[in-house]
Amino acid sequence: RQMSRVGIVTDSAADLRPAVARELDITVVPSRIQIGDRIWMDGPDLRTPSFYRRAFASSETPRVLPPTSQQFVDAYAHLAQVSDAIVSVHMTSALDGTVRAARRARSLLGQRCDVHVLDSRFASVALGMLVTEAAKAAQGGAAASEIERLLRGLIPHTYCAFFVDSSERLERAGITVEGCSGEKWDTQ
């Protein structure tokens, strides 16, 4: 059997270190951060102490915007040149429109490449762990359908908790989920 090349894509909500993304050949499509009228691309270069000071000192609430469909089209088209298929794993659709943008990009790309878009149901470290497992499977020669099956098996057994001092900033940024105020948060 000829080994196929599967490209792995995620978004910056996976919080992957750049060295890990490079080592595992993961394409990270950046979210966008909006404060007032300015928009920045998310990523390690943006996440500096001076940016955080500016963001939290601003009277405007920072908003995280999902990547655009065009950002995904560009990433998929680039990977399609060297891949037989793409597995694109993203932040939970309960929090933002990243999965929707990725699915739209898949339809805009048409038949140029087989793209599998998965809603991880998570963000941050849990998403990063799932993406890392997908990349390791791809490097091991797994087909896209095998990687998708692996992730669908891992998702129900993955758990994530996070804590904030106050949900006020989350609510102002528009990332509130019903039942998230101090209770167990289950997006399934």
PLM features: what roles do these ranges have?
Residues 55-56, 80, 138, 171:
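Hydrophobic residues in alpha-helical segments
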